[in-house]
Amino acid sequence: MVMRSPTMLAPLLLGALGTILGCGEGATPSQDEHFIEGFQPPALGPNEVRVVAPLVTEIPSGGDVSWCTYIANPFEGEVDVVQSRGFQSKFGHHAILMEVAGAEARLGESRKCTDADMTNARFLAGGSDAAAQFRIPEGVAFRIQKQSVLMIQTHWINTSTSAAVGQAVFNIAVQPPNGTRQAAQLFAAYTAKVTLPPRGPAKATTECKIQQDMSLFALGGHAHEWGTHVRLSIDRAGKNEMLYDHDWEPHFQADPPLTYFETKAPLQLHAGDVLHVDCEYQNTSDAEIRFPREMCVGMGFYFPGTADIQCGDGHWSTGNGGMP
């Protein structure tokens, strides 16, 4: 049961299945009880509950690890996620809460992610610490089905000289579906062909032919600390239209600027349009850097949507789950 009273705590899932804590405005997290040393996620906002993921204990020095943990759906009935914020401890790249159809047999599993984990996964909440800035507009939500199994996918890049332990939490607000909200989902276009020579500039680019009409309420780019510029443009009706054009800063890796659109006037992408994603970099290290240590991604959220869409190096696919 999810308690919505601002004065109650409702621990529903324990141990390997994670924990949900609720809820209320200005609730102060208890580091000693719930969080690892040095990790102090922001307090809960109005009507939010907190999902605390199980620890990731196997992040080796220099490791680039994606970890998948399956938990039971803690909510009674079908609910709409109407706001979400995701947070990670040190070395976190992103944390995403997803719904996975047909994953009942995996309940309680926690391990390195495989391609099978990404099949049939749908975005629900999170992203990165940038989720603190993420806004879900009125009339749109990410829907959790009544009987679903949830998966927490976390990505860690340990740049230290020793092994690390990681933790992720989600502060989310949910409401019962009321017939007026449309379900939304994630769209991402990216390239895995990213190579930065030592101490030099570099570029990466990809294009994606849109396969279906989409209405987006948010659009943005994603690169890491060596990015210097990210552009998204669209070819349609014989013209090229600039959609997103940002100089890049290292902190944008966790806090990328997003462009928002009103749901009554969303950004329209049409079948046959060609989306271009162009990224520029300056490698300040002595080592060659490749994907996924550096990335070039265009991403957004579309509605109505029942499955996430990924377009990797021009290959369109659905239901693969989350960001690259």
Where do the protein language model's features map onto the residues?
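Beta-strand-centric surfaces of beta-sandwich/beta-rich domains
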Residues: 32-215, 220-324
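C-terminal motif of bacterial Sec signal peptides marking the signal peptidase cleavage site
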Residues: 19-22
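Bacterial signal peptide processing site
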Residues: 24-26
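Bacterial N-terminal signal peptides that target proteins for export
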Residues: 1-13
